[in-house]
Amino acid sequence: MSHQQQQAHFDISSNSTLTTNTIATTTNASVSSSPQLNKAQMAIAEAMALKMHEEEKKKREEKKRKRDNEELLSKQVRTKLENERKKLDDSESINASTNQELYSLFNDLQMISHDHNISFDTPELVVVGMQSDGKSSFIESLLGFQFNIVETNIGTRRPLIIQMINNPSKQQPSCRFKKEDYSNSYGGSSSSTSTTSGNSNHNTDKQQNVSSSQGGGGGSNNLNEDKWEEYETPVNELTEEIIRRTNERTGRAGDRVSSIPIFLRVEFAHCSNLNIYDTPGFRKGGDERLKYEISEMVKKLIEPKNRIIVCLEQSNVEWANTISRPLVKKIDPDFSRTILVNTKFDNRVKELRNRESAHKYLEGEGIIAQKKPFFISLPLKRNLETHRFKDAMKETFLDDYRKLLEIGFDENRFGGQIGIYKVRQYVENLLHEKYQQNLLPSMLQLESICKKTEADIVRVKKELSDNNIVTLKEKVMRFVSNFNGQIERLLEGSVVGDPDEFGQTLLQEKENCSVQPWPGYNFDFDIQNSNYSLYGGAQYERLLNEFEFVIHSKEFPETSINEVASAIGVSKSHNSPIYELAATNIFQTKSKKVLLPLIDIVLQRSSYIMKRLFDISVSILGKDENESSHTVSLYEHFLKELQSQYEKFIQTIESECKSRLKDDFEMFTKIVDWNLLSGLTEIKPYNYLKVSPEETKQRVISIMDCKKLEDEPLSRSRNIDDDTYQKVCMIAGRLFSGIRFFFSKLIRNKLNAFFLDPMFQKLGSFVTDYFSKLNDQKYEEMFQLGLKELENKLHKLEFQLIDCKKNRDKFKDVYNRMKQSLNQNQNQNSSSSSNSASSSNNNVIIKHQQSLNGKFSTPDKNSLTMSPFTSPFTQSNYHQHNNNNYQINQQPLDINNDHYFDQN
């Protein structure tokens, strides 16, 4: 017997003896005082004493049992926490090597795809939520380091797009911002062109091609370096730089937002290749205009179907009162591409008193079946070094987990939903799926390139063996004729050029045309088809529509009172002021300054659109193997000669059209026809001198919507006071608005008559005449050089074929490794399911299969360790749904079958 047990026995014996003695003393006293007390009463007293003794004994035993249970529970909690901590530590070391292998592998695949012009999209996450829901802290946890953006309100005014690039050589984060042009921005701008809705290689939204055109994904080899700042920004200066860029675009008042994103490129050895969008927070109250602008901006960001939405809500907000989730549901009704995350869980977990209350909360209310949210807490401390930040995240997670264990929550049921590590693992799995979804199509495209290269080699060899001047002349004339016809078809409207490949959105057109932007234009009008990839006549017509919006948005320039006073001179025959003459002079000068530059820009943009058709037409004709004359497209020197004549023709009509337009502008402004203006009812008079951007926007929309409004009479005055100044300026502004309206219509007509029509009527004869008049010597010079070019091209094609086959085999090797890993995981899954039914519902394989069928579920709760090929990759037939998720049939592909690619 232990010392404690002996002591307890002694206490019980002592207490029992004391109680018995007390009762005995009382009884003896009673007997002595009452001789009539019988033995039955004595027995009752003894029984009562024994009962009291037993009750006291039970209480002591209950206290001891409770104390033992608490000690056992505490020991179990400590053991589980230590196991969880060890699991986290082990996963860090394992993932450090396995993920690095994966990143390196997919970097190679992305570079191969880039070299062969194959689409290989970088996955994208869009983080949305209310203000103070912890969006920036969540992003920091994915990045692995803090940059203190959460201490400011800058995230509420401009989207921040972080392009994470895995770079093994960067053991510390390397951060660079994308260059920005603030020349057309001003503090009062509420928004700008819709540059934030789009995706990589998704043609309905290609204007925001951050993965390719803006430089994201796949390592720095794919980046257009001149779009990024030459210098790196230290991590501790990121916040200051983001604030500066935000204020430059939206002003310092804090009451404006801009849809133009800030791009931040982060190269780091310990991150995935991923684009993350940090969005302005939804507003619950305050300025209704600001709430609406933010809501619309975020909707545009989450609309692209390829983007994964991370919807954050604070854990202390009741399920029925959530705001972000209903807004996201409007865009993603079944949450098929949405991850639900409840932040600041540490504020909620301390309110959970028992197992039942914990389970009720963790199950969630009003959420689609099988859609389980994550619950995370993140460190509150700021300015932590990278390794301390990781340790703080670990301790924060373990603290939440400890509190849940203490109230006995079901680990098997809810463990996979707790902590940032489960979210990160889940996101990693999704990234692997996205990469794998790219793998098979890329492999098929590589095989197609191999076959095309083999066919090109055959064509070049045949052309080299059959080459003489007479034959080449005939081929050239047929090719030129077909080329002219193809240009006409592209202008009239045709999809033969593949808009997905050759089309441009309005943003892409502006970025690639090398033409200066519209001066002083900073509005987000709904330009027709601006988000669609167009070429030819459709792209030209979109430009004219944009031009009308631009010219109507031009306001009468600020005019000083000195200018007005100087413009009111004297007549040859009298000294009476002529206000109409003063207003006319001011109007003529200001109109030339504001409107004339637009002529140059619209003509240069028109020429750019027409010049693009050369490459499109040559590509179409070169793919037509049924026409033997199209083999002349193999001769680079001939194509350069043809392109030279084609662009010479465009430059000629551009010059002629510019001359006519400027002459017409002089005609319109030289002599003012007041009767013409007085009959104009489309323009409603307004204060031409003080116009806000919002008023300009509404006025342009009303004009473009053809609303009929009233006119205004002229007025006179003699004194050069403020009233006279206002009247003269209003007259000049009235003249300006009239010319602005009529001239926009005139330019459209002139462009169609003197720029577009010659492309139909004169281009064919111009190019045909040129080549028909070339002498034999010129042909010999042109095609003798072409023979050397063909020989060089043959060598390049042969080398390309070798390289392409090597890369194709590399893709096959990756695929086989994934398939092998899948089989191993399936075997492990089968084994574990026989031991535990609950764990089989949460393993990684089933999670992936559910995700690929459009449902995201909870990641594996039993392990944070993930090999680089945990995700399954099966049957090649992709069935694309409306939400752009992919179903994959379950039988594995045998790509090693020699006839596989022939069958597909």
From Swiss-Prot:
Q: Where does GTP bind?
A: 129-136, 278-282, 343-346
Q: Name one GO biological process term.
A: mitotic cytokinesis
Q: Which InterPro entries match?
A: Dynamin, Dynamin_GTPase, Dynamin_N, G_DYNAMIN_dom, P-loop_NTPase
In residue numbers, the region (Disordered) covers 53-93, 169-227, 821-840, 853-904
**Reaction(s) catalysed by this chain's protein:** GTP + H2O = GDP + phosphate + H(+)
EC number(s) on file: 3.6.5.5
Gene Ontology terms, MF aspect: GTP binding; GTPase activity; microtubule binding
Q: Where is this region: G5 motif?
A: 378-381
Region entry G2 motif, spans: 155-157
**Where in the sequence does UniProt note compositional bias of the Low complexity kind?**
183-213, 877-891
Where do the segments described as G4 motif lie?
343-346
Q: Where is the composition biased (Basic and acidic residues)?
A: 67-90
Q: Where is the Dynamin-type G domain?
A: 119-441
Where does this protein have coiled-coil stretches?
Answer: 44-102, 781-811
Extent of the signal sequence: none
Annotated GO CC locations: cytoplasm; membrane; microtubule
Class of this enzyme: hydrolase
Q: Which UniProt keywords apply?
A: Cell cycle, Cell division, Coiled coil, Cytoplasm, GTP-binding, Hydrolase, Motor protein, Nucleotide-binding
Pfam families the UniProt entry points to: Dynamin_N
| Region (G1 motif) residue spans | 129-136
Record localization: Cytoplasm
Q: What does this protein do?
A: Involved in cytokinesis. May hydrolyze GTP.
The protein's name is Dynamin-like protein C
Q: Which organism is it from?
A: Dictyostelium discoideum
Its lineage opens with: Eukaryota, Amoebozoa, Evosea, Eumycetozoa, Dictyostelia
* Gene that produces this protein: dlpC
